[in-house]
């Protein structure tokens, strides 16, 4: 993406962030496969993975992880993708992030604390 101007790059990232929120796995994967950094983030540090996880898109989360997304990158509020998924009740996303080795003790709150708070500790058992 280095051939793009800063404004063009910002626009591509904004589109990709919307694709992550919407769970448009195919199109988002195409963006990443053509050079968009897999850990691209918005101004608040919410990565593509964070937004896909928060909005319950397990397939999109899996596709991003398969392309090298870091499951432990936290946003500017120190929130992790797995804690966000627990907060939103996205059980399948939690399972995908656990399989990817997401750190259950990172962030504020930690995934363990979020699971306890929202009665979802069974998702972290084992």
Please report, for each region that a protein language model flagged, where it lies by residue.
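N-terminal segments that cap or nucleate solenoid repeat domains
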Residues: 2-44
């Amino acid at each position: 993406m280095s051939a793009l101007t800063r404004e063009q790059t910002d626009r591509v990232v904004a589109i990709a962030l919307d694709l992550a929120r919407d769970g448009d796995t195919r199109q988002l994967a195409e963006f990443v496969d053509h050079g968009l950094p897999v850990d691209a983030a918005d101004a608040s540090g919410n990565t593509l993975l964070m937004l896909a996880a928060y909005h319950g898109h397990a397939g999109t989360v899996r596709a991003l992880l398969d392309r090298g997304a870091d499951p432990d990158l936290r946003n500017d509020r120190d929130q992790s993708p797995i804690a966000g998924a627990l907060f939103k009740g996205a059980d399948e996303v939690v399972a995908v992030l656990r399989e990817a080795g997401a750190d259950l003790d990172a962030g504020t709150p930690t995934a363990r604390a979020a699971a306890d708070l929202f009665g979802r500790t069974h998702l972290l058992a084992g």
